[in-house]
Amino acid sequence: MKQSKVFIPTMREVPAEAEALSHRLLLKAGLIKQSTSGIYSYLPLATRVLNNISKIIREEMESIDAVEILMPALQQAELWEESGRWSAYGPELMRLKDRNGREFALGPTHEEVVTSLVRDELKSYKQLPLTLFQIQSKYRDEKRPRFGLLRGREFLMKDAYSFHSDEASLDATYQDMYQAYSRIFKRVGINARPVVADSGAIGGSHTHEFMALSEIGEDTIVYSNESDYAANIEKAEVVYHPSHKHSALAELTKVETPNVKTAQEVAEYLKRPLDEIVKTMIFKIDGEFIMFLVRGHHELNEVKLKSYFGTEHVEMATPDEIVNLVDANPGSLGPIFDKDIKIYADNYLQDLNNFVVGANEDHYHYINVNIGRDFDVTEYGDFRFITQGEMLSDGSGVAQFAEGIEVGQVFKLGTKYSESMNATFLDNQGKAQPLIMGCYGIGVSRTLSAIVEQNNDENGIIWPKSVTPFDIHLITINPKKDDQRTLGDQLYQKLMDSYDVLYDDRKERAGVKFNDSDLIGLPVRVVVGKRAEEGIVEVKQRINGLSEEVQIDELEYYLQELFKNIK
């Protein structure tokens, strides 16, 4: 394809709000253009990359007998009401009404639609298992779209759904999909690590995320250098190892703490270690207000609260609700009161005595607080995030942290949707049973960004061979010279038989062409320049900058050998 005919609006400067490296490079190299916050147009180069990613996904899906379909993006509210997610999903669900006042959503996922699709057709165990997938735009009303394609309001996704008669069949498909995802991310050039994860609003009993390692990643991965343990920090279990070092109980005392609210400020003011300060928080869980306690150097994990109580309805109490409950502001909140509120504490509070809590009075705290004497704990549990250096739950070593971008996730849904939506089949005994389901997603547009995050240098993108928009960037330095233009045109026609070629025939300075070439990042550059009359061109590899002059009658063989070694 001739570059003069392709829409590639490269930029010299990018908007200041483009924080992520991939966002800057995709804008600068002319692959995407923002329409509005969180919504982008994919320009020709990006479209070619997305097509290549999608081709690899389709090949791997077909290899495990997944069948492609295409479902509507516009979903009627009635389906979401059947599953219970219309009210539970929250403000991220993009809702709209038609001219008759009927409610719809722009789909962020398709569990409801696909369950509705198959429930009238899958009637016997003999029709199972079945796996369906699609590649389609999804929608989510993000509160704060950021990082370009990594957190947008419209995004391209591959979502697959499997249906089974028993758990063994689901397990087999889950493993097939897990392995297919591993192959997909390897083929597209991403270093992605599977980690144990939380199922979130989709639900289900078992799930893994595939995380592309990146400094800009919004998720923290907990891993071990001594085993294959890896988990999203939201799911990393904290194993309690008691270290009771209790001193004699001191007298409970209320002390003044003027204008200090955070645990760190309290520790500094009272000259006490941060881990002896106890933070108190109140959450509303399924409509009930419950108090939670963690030590000052730890952070409460809301995902673990949802898992512990088996609900998605967990939200922090508002300041007004806290005042109404215990007559205290959040900054002075503590567990010593005469109200009927359950108190749950993180396991590691069992190691403490003579600690510090809020006194439920502005500018005051209690010191020398002790559980059992001053207040009672309803139950202990693992309610916090693991910290770097703590022992891992598999006993393999200590927790290490890395940042990652979620590019895929696989779920065992079980019967969550089939039971609520009455999707049943007849088993081999003729008895009606709910379909057992799995679902599996890959963020296709997010994968595009993740590839760029991991494959670049100071000059621009370095595309992996498997997804590159073109194989070769053919550049004529000065197309006004007959020998260069003629040789460039001849090579373009010849190379197109074996490769996808982007032919820079523009009437631009050589420096502009080379800068754009580095920025766009095709694997190989072939330059027709001052030695064109001698039948010699320069061949340069993007990944390492190595270049060599090659006779044109040897070029075909040279490129064949070169591409064998390019990843």
Curated annotation (Swiss-Prot):
Catalytic activity, as annotated: tRNA(Pro) + L-proline + ATP = L-prolyl-tRNA(Pro) + AMP + diphosphate
GO CC field: cytosol
Keyword Cytoplasm appears in the UniProt entry: yes
E.C. code: 6.1.1.15
Localisation per UniProt entry: Cytoplasm
Main location per the UniProt record: cytoplasm
GO molecular-function term, one example from the UniProt record: proline-tRNA ligase activity
GO biological process, one term: prolyl-tRNA aminoacylation
Keywords per UniProt: Aminoacyl-tRNA synthetase, ATP-binding, Cytoplasm, Ligase, Nucleotide-binding, Protein biosynthesis
Protein origin, superkingdom: Bacteria
Pfam families: HGTP_anticodon, tRNA-synt_2b, tRNA_edit
Function (record text): Catalyzes the attachment of proline to tRNA(Pro) in a two-step reaction: proline is first activated by ATP to form Pro-AMP and then transferred to the acceptor end of tRNA(Pro). As ProRS can inadvertently accommodate and process non-cognate amino acids such as alanine and cysteine, to avoid such errors it has two additional distinct editing activities against alanine. One activity is designated as 'pretransfer' editing and involves the tRNA(Pro)-independent hydrolysis of activated Ala-AMP.
HAMAP family, per the entry: Pro_tRNA_synth_type1 (MF_01569)
Subunit record text: Homodimer.
Domain notes: Consists of three domains: the N-terminal catalytic domain, the editing domain and the C-terminal anticodon-binding domain.
PANTHER family registered for this protein in UniProt: MITOCHONDRIAL RIBOSOME PROTEIN L39/PROLYL-TRNA LIGASE FAMILY MEMBER, PROLINE--TRNA LIGASE
Family: Belongs to the class-II aminoacyl-tRNA synthetase family. ProS type 1 subfamily.
Protein name in the entry: Proline--tRNA ligase
Annotated source species: Staphylococcus epidermidis (strain ATCC 35984 / DSM 28319 / BCRC 17069 / CCUG 31568 / BM 3577 / RP62A)
Biological classification of the source: Bacteria, Bacillati, Bacillota, Bacilli, Bacillales
